[in-house]
Curated annotation (Swiss-Prot):
The lineage of its organism: Archaea, Methanobacteriati, Methanobacteriota, Methanomada group, Methanococci. The keyword Transmembrane helix applies. This is Uncharacterized protein MJ0526. InterPro entries: DUF2108_membrane (IPR019213), Prd_NiFe_hyd_3_EhaD (IPR011308). The keyword Transcription regulation does not apply. One of its GO terms (cellular component) is plasma membrane. Keywords: Cell membrane, Membrane, Transmembrane, Transmembrane helix. It is found in: Cell membrane. The chain crosses the membrane at residues 1-21, 29-49, 51-71.
Length: 92
């Protein structure tokens, strides 16, 4: 029995369960990254190395974009609390 599909499957299952159960968005993004790592491992175990290279290059970029979007959301919420309902409008 090969070890790579087994470990990758466990990563996928743990990542999926973590995404469902966690309520903190940062933890959800981390668990989504764990799920993506498991998927890359399963792709490699099927010998689709070209697809694994592309997905391993795209996965960190997508994770960083998700983190930046969430941090932007947090700063917007904090500014709205600071200004109350009169959030300054920068454009019409």
């Amino acid at each position: 029995m090969e070890v790579l599909p087994l470990v990758s499957g466990i990563c996928c299952i743990l990542g999926g369960i973590g995404v469902i159960l966690h309520t903190n968005p940062i933890n959800k993004i981390i668990m989504l990254a764990l799920l993506e790592i498991g998927m890359i491992g399963l792709i490699v175990s099927c010998y689709y190395l070209d697809i694994a290279i592309v997905s391993s290059l795209c996965e960190p970029i997508c994770t960083v974009i998700l983190l930046l979007g969430y941090l932007k959301y947090l700063t917007t919420v904090k500014k709205k609390k600071r200004y109350g309902r009169n959030l300054p409008i920068l454009s019409k």
